[in-house]
Regions:
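Non-heme di-metal
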Residues: 1-198
Length: 198
């Protein structure tokens, strides 16, 4: 448990930059995506835990997943309403966030005595291999956001925002092709805050 605390304290003290600056539109894009991603990952962990006979862990993750979905729905609704009153600026903010990729707060993840960010890639590989959160989940989230905000039906856009929309409409398909080519390394990673179930 101490190593979990150390990792958490490092994460807090190292801070993170989610790429939104002080732009409220970008912040809402970030939270809409991030909350859906955490819903997906907690829901997947719940399934894995249930399959492994860890009912309490599964139940806890389901509860957290439910909270994440409620947050996602709220932020998604904020953006839907912003699109109604400021479609071009909202489209450009969405475009900027997706073009430069949504980064998770844990990108600087590290263990005790580790370098900043030294753990995130390993953690991501394990999560992808275990089916907790995959590149296909990322693609699915893009598709869901495009559908939730009716990106293809928004009117009154500037020419710049129209170009942004065209990019956003093609992005999920492009990312899906990339996801199909990704090979997750079959390496074993040991984390200080996890004991093998052996």
């Amino acid at each position: 448990m101490r190593e979990v605390e150390v990792t958490t304290q490092h994460l807090i003290s190292d801070g993170f930059d989610i790429g939104t600056s002080r732009d409220p539109y970008k912040n809402f894009v970030y939270t809409s995506s991030q909350e859906l991603a955490t819903y997906v990952s907690h829901n997947n962990v719940a399934k894995i835990a249930k399959k492994a006979g860890m009912k309490n862990l599964g139940k806890m993750c389901k509860i957290i997943a439910g909270d994440e979905m409620r947050h996602h729905k709220a932020y998604t609704e904020f953006i839907r309403q912003i699109f109604e009153v400021d479609p071009s600026e909202m489209m450009l903010a969405y475009f900027d966030m997706m073009k430069f990729k949504i980064t998770m707060p844990a990108m600087h993840l590290r263990e005790s005595f580790g370098d900043q960010g030294s753990l995130f890639e390993k953690f991501s590989e394990v999560a992808q291999r275990a089916g907790v959160y995959t590149s296909f989940d990322y693609v699915d989230i893009m598709k869901k956001l495009n559908a939730a905000w009716n990106i293809d039906k928004i009117t009154g856009l500037t020419s710049e925002a129209e170009k942004a929309r065209a990019y956003l409409m093609k992005l999920p398909e492009r990312m899906e092709r990339i996801a199909e080519r990704i090979v997750v390394p079959d390496t074993n990673h040991q984390f200080k805050w996890m004991n093998p179930l052996v």
